[in-house]
């Protein structure tokens, strides 16, 4: 299966695997086994983040996989993200150094700004009084230095609207390679897709299954009658159908699971396709953003007074 895996080319010339393992909400104690299983199944992209609180465990597993000869470092694409408490420019390099130490790596393939939001250094919660003013171009300049140092092969952003991404492109010396955002059949992001395509920025989709298993977001994407009907027609599961939709839309996908059977099922999305007449039916699915970022909005204490401002109307 590993030989079949597809890639998308980044504006750096590097290739990002089309299917990656998401590790958000993968609990310590189980995330390591999930990463090991995924790599052995054939996954070549592991999506991490400082905020997920599990990079130390992932690092131990990666080292063992390398030491045991299961996979070579250069065959894996490792993404991580800088958390919002480290976005003051002088803190950016230290944040990546901590992630590299935790992951036991010399470099990451991709380093993302997790949100266009800054929180007070040292805080752990999302209280409004912890939200700080953010200077995205200055933080980005510090991110660019990570590329210069070789510790990040590519840099990008996450949860950026079309407008915020456009503003960053205007200011950047090193253009963002990726915008990682929520993307699934119930939140298709057509406007952002078109903008990213026009600027050579790769869109990567987190929660491509709508975050099943979470309690704090409405996550019934896979119960869409459209998806259920198409899945039945083509003889695939609803999850595989939703994931394949993402690939055919032209973006990489980051399904998260700690169940080996589902990790395997989620990887079996290559070598077949959804016929055009069925693919067109996805346009009938009702749209709703699941991950809204309400914690980052406050009428007096945040730069973003409303969700409309946070997402620049893409809500």
Curated annotation (Swiss-Prot):
The modification Phosphoserine is found at residue 295. It is an enzyme of class 1 (oxidoreductase). Its EC number is 1.1.1.-. Keywords: Acetylation, NADP, Oxidoreductase, Phosphoprotein. The active site is at 52 (proton donor). CDD domains: AKR_AKR4C1-15. One of its GO terms (molecular function) is oxidoreductase activity. One of its GO terms (cellular component) is cytosol. PROSITE patterns: ALDOKETO_REDUCTASE_2, ALDOKETO_REDUCTASE_3. It comes from the Eukaryota. The modification N-acetylalanine is found at residue 2. NADP(+) binds at residues 23-24, 47, 114, 158-159, 180, 207-213, 256-258, 262-266. PANTHER family: ALDO/KETO REDUCTASE (PTHR11732). Belongs to the aldo/keto reductase family. Oxidoreductase that may act on a broad range of substrates such as ketosteroids, aldehydes, ketones and sugars. This is Aldo-keto reductase family 4 member C11. The gene is AKR4C11.
